[in-house]
């Protein structure tokens, strides 16, 4: 199969998934096509990069197009979720939190922090071994960690302003 044909197939499958998720009303026809193309490319790129470059793998379109699990569309979904949250927060990033100790953070937020602090080391390891799959794994783990954080406690409706600012700042760092 030629690359262009594969991209077209992935784009069409992404478009079908968007339409079947009852989200078509959120898109103009042009935006739907563009979003489907972006999802298809993310699926292709992440599917290839997540595997050890020294190993063979079978490209499974259905598996790599899922919006859950270790896929490009899942990572895109996590990023779009964070971006949407930040737009709704409309917070000046100079906001400061009164929380001083990691012990004051919810466990799910601490887990995100741990993943974020390890990222520079992971990037270096990925470069040193010429293995982008290391970075892909870390990005997936961060997305999972953020999802747990997002689902564990309110962010935008947090009543404690200091904690709310901290959570939004953590979202900014993750994005």
Residue ranges and their predicted role:
Residues 1-175:
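Non-catalytic interaction-recognition regions
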């Amino acid at each position: 199969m030629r690359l262009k044909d594969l991209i077209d197939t992935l784009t069409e499958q992404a478009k079908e998934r968007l339409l079947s998720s009852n989200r078509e009303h959120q898109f103009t026809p042009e935006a739907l096509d563009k979003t489907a193309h972006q999802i298809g490319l993310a699926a292709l790129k992440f599917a290839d990069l997540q595997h050890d470059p020294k190993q063979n793998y079978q490209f499974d379109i259905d598996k790599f197009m899922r919006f859950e699990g270790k896929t490009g569309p899942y990572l895109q979904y996590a990023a779009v979720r964070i971006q949407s949250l930040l737009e709704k927060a409309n917070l000046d990033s100079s906001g400061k939190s009164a929380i001083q100790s990691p012990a004051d953070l919810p466990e799910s937020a601490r887990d995100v922090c741990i993943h974020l602090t390890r990222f520079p080391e992971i990037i270096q390891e990925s470069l040193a071994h010429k293995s982008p799959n290391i970075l892909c794994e870390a990005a997936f783990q961060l997305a999972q960690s953020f999802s747990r954080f997002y689902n564990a406690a309110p962010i935008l409706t947090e009543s404690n302003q200091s904690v709310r600012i901290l959570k939004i700042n953590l979202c900014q760092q993750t994005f």
